[in-house]
Design a protein with these regions (language model features):
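Fe(II)/2-oxoglutarate oxygenase catalytic core
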Residues: 1-168, 174-198
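Single conserved hydrophobic/aromatic residue that forms the stacking wall/gate
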Residues: 197-206
Length: 206
């Protein structure tokens, strides 16, 4: 599996927040490029993990399709963009010990058949994986093209995240979040999860 390694985040000392969004992280044209690439990989039914580390399709928990965007010469620019945004956001708000991306980027599609992802966290421990620290969600679709499909974060109060096209939202992987059912159109997003304590060889640095 490709590994995208990050150099340490700068310390801007702004203060910790539950989540933060980076406006205009990607242009509409770049969002279209990502969509075309993700669709070319033929997204399949999304799976969920379990305590015994098995994975299965469980539409009562998650109903969507996804494909995995590997790090290569055609996608390096996406990893670079996300890596730079992540370093800045982490330096401003959390200052976690983040080493990089240990999974491919997840291109996800929510169709108007009420596709959704119920409340969950991203930092479930897996024996062969380092701890997840920060999650990133990129809004690829123009919000006028669908209804529902809201990314929501829950700290006791439910917060609906801005869905402007190209916006990048970052939050700790232990934060409870969900995607509400899509009722019209199609919502497409890109998800990245950063890790700490990578011990495998480095293939890229930013």
């Amino acid at each position: 599996m490709s590994i995208y390694r990050l150099s340490p985040s700068p310390n801007f000392g702004v203060g910790e927040v539950m989540y933060e969004s980076w406006e205009d992280g990607f242009t509409p044209e770049e969002c279209e490029r990502i969509i075309q690439y993700g669709e070319s990989l033929c997204p399949e039914n999304s799976v969920v993990g379990s305590d015994d580390e098995s994975q299965e399709v469980a539409e009562q928990i998650r109903k969507s399709k996804n494909s995995w965007i590997e790090l290569n010469k055609d996608t390096e620019w996406i990893y670079d963009r996300l890596g730079n945004i992540l370093r800045c956001m982490n330096g401003m708000h959390w200052r976690f010990d983040i080493h990089g991306f240990h999974e491919h980027l997840q291109y996800t599609v929510y169709h108007d058949d009420k596709s959704f992802y119920r409340w969950h966290v991203d930092n479930m421990m897996m024996s062969d994986m380092p701890p997840r620290k920060l999650s990133m969600s990129v809004q690829l679709t123009d919000p006028a093209d669908y209804e529902g499909g809201e990314l929501q974060i829950n700290d006791g109060t439910i917060h609906t995240v801005a869905n402007d096209r190209g916006i990048v939202t970052v939050f700790p992987s232990y934060i409870l979040h969900r995607v509400t059912p899509v009722t019209r159109g199609t919502r497409r997003s890109l998800v990245a999860v950063s890790y700490t304590h990578l011990t495998l060889p480095t293939s890229h640095n930013v």
